[in-house]
Design a protein with these regions (language model features):
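Insoluble glucan recognition modules
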Residues: 1-293
């Protein structure tokens, strides 16, 4: 028996009984039985040849905590009625710059019908780790906390529409906990390209919000022409959402080649993208597409 494998198995047994990491190391008896069986030349068990030993007692086994540390997920993916519950085209949530345990995305939530709502997971799979309504804690400080309902185990809304969904992941013991904020779906045109030409998040810079899951968010008209350019100091079209207690640029994004490109944990998004006076930005967050025209 591989010693590391046995130590891991024993640790899992004690954790399942309610013990926590700080209670290790410990000394405990271990009871083992050995099994022998004849096999064919191809490794197949020969029926009727199995034999099991008496119980072997190891009276004092010194056991260190032998499970790997639990970490917050590096990625989160969203599925739901908006994409027919397909992991193949799941939305990847965006990490807040400098806060790799916090993710966000604009998402359309509904609450009616057996397939309503959304779930999220750190893998693109139905593997038992997906989080629905019962696996999240709704942040009471959310703009729209009262709208969120249990939609057949999924995360749904009593008022179908768009939400800025922010998931904060923390480790408690051996479990990952999800504190989820559901804010207004505010998307801002930002910076020099706006009519005001400033960096404050003001109502005049808000995108309009569509009524459907496949609709487009539309910006106000660009008020100042921006030339774009290869460096971060060049003026360009910039867009963001606002994450509580974070600077605006920590949740910014832009449109490249008709696709939404998120900054995430990256640096300045270059090259900057040009925009002419009167043009608007059109964004589809279900398809992750965009256009400036």
């Amino acid at each position: 028996v591989d010693a590391a494998e046995l130590a891991s198995l024993l640790t899992e047994m004690y954790v399942a009984k309610g013990m926590s990491e700080h209670q290790f190391p410990l000394t405990a008896p271990v009871y083992i039985r050995a099994k022998a069986v004849q096999t064919t030349a191809y490794g197949q068990e020969i029926e009727g040849t199995s034999i099991t030993s008496n119980v072997i007692t190891l009276n004092k086994v010194y056991l260190l905590f032998s499970l790997p540390p639990v970490k917050t997920p590096e990625k989160l993916y969203l599925v739901g009625s908006f994409n027919k519950w397909s992991w193949d085209n799941a939305l990847e949530m965006i990490p807040v710059n400098g806060s790799p345990n916090i993710f966000w995305h604009l998402v359309y939530l509904d609450g009616e019908g057996n397939s309503a709502g959304v779930k999220f997971n750190s893998d693109k799979a139905w593997n038992g780790n997906e989080a629905g309504f019962e696996k999240i804690t709704i942040n009471p400080a959310s703009d729209n906390a009262a709208d969120i309902i249990n939609a057949n185990g999924n995360i749904g809304s009593s008022k179908a529409g768009w939400y800025l969904m922010i998931v904060e992941c923390t480790v408690v013991g051996r479990d990952i906990k999800y504190n989820v904020t559901f804010n207004k779906p505010n998307v801002y045109l930002q910076g020099v390209c706006t009519a005001a030409g400033g960096w404050d998040l003001i109502p005049d810079n808000l995108f309009s919000v569509p009524a459907t899951a496949d609709g487009e968010f539309v910006s106000p008209a660009i008020g100042n022409a921006v030339s774009g350019g290869p460096s971060g100091s060049d003026p360009g079209v910039r867009i963001c959402v606002k994450i509580p207690n974070a600077d605006w640029w920590k949740a910014e994004f832009i449109v490249y080649d008709k696709k939404i490109a998120y900054r995430g944990n990256g640096g300045d998004q270059t090259p900057r993208v040009a925009g002419a006076v009167g043009q608007k930005v059109y964004l589809n967050f279900t398809k992750e597409t965009g256009e400036i025209k």
